[in-house]
Amino acid sequence: MTLEHGHTPAEIAARLDQQSGSGRLRDAIFGGIDGTVTTFAIVAGVQGAGLSAGIVVALGMANVLADGFSMAAGNYAGTKAVADDRRRLWDVEERHIRENRQGELDELDQILARKGLRGQVQREARKMISADKDQWISLMLTEEYGLPPVDARPIRAAIVIFAAFVAAGLLPLLPYLIGLAPAFSWSIAISGLTFFGIGAIKSRWTLIPWWRSGIETLLIGGLAASLAFAVGRLFHP
């Protein structure tokens, strides 16, 4: 059986160094799915209402830019809140180590005990961890407060989600922008491939097969577009 990844020292080091990128990958996938779903839903709704291609482009572009910015701003605010909380708790733990070192060592003992360390091994681990204050505090933030082990970068997260939203959100509009006919049929095909592709990529971080993840994402996008199209038909002249 082929293992999912290698275990040479270089491969292990590279994999550990990449942990901080998982959040950006999540943001890119989330932004890509939402960008495609919302834009194609607008295309389907306007098409269902029987309105012109110009209105499709105008409303679609407005959604891509405005909703993309809104998502990026919301992501920035949420990520910044986590980063600010991490910095606040870092200062708290640093002060506690300075003013009540034994109490913090007792906390570290309990954390290590919950991980199964006992006796001499536990004492050696405590000694080594507490010798590096930054690593000690980082461990406490993760184990005591449940914060991620790496510091969040709000601006980078916002840029990633905005770029993914815009890039994926423009795809359903592409046939209208370059004059492909019939534009709506092309938009359906392009959006369907985008939904499936993003879902297939997402499967790398799930336990389900790539084709199933692709189909699930395709069905979600298709359902949203169908609802929008049905609402649009209600207002068809």
Predicted regions and their residues:
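Alpha-helical transmembrane segments and their lipid-water interface positions
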Residues: 38, 70-82, 134-138, 142, ...
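Structural signature of hydrophobic alpha-helical transmembrane segments
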Residues: 181-193
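Interfacial loop-to-transmembrane junctions
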Residues: 197-222
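Core segments of transmembrane alpha-helices
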Residues: 35-40, 161-172
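Internal alpha-helical transmembrane segments
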Residues: 2-78
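Helix-coil boundary and interhelical linker segments in multi-pass alpha-helical membrane proteins
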Residues: 43-58, 173-183, 230-237
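Cytosol/matrix-facing amphipathic helices and coiled-coil assembly/linker segments
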Residues: 2-27, 79-161
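Alpha-helical transmembrane segments of multipass membrane proteins
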Residues: 66, 70, 168, 172, ...
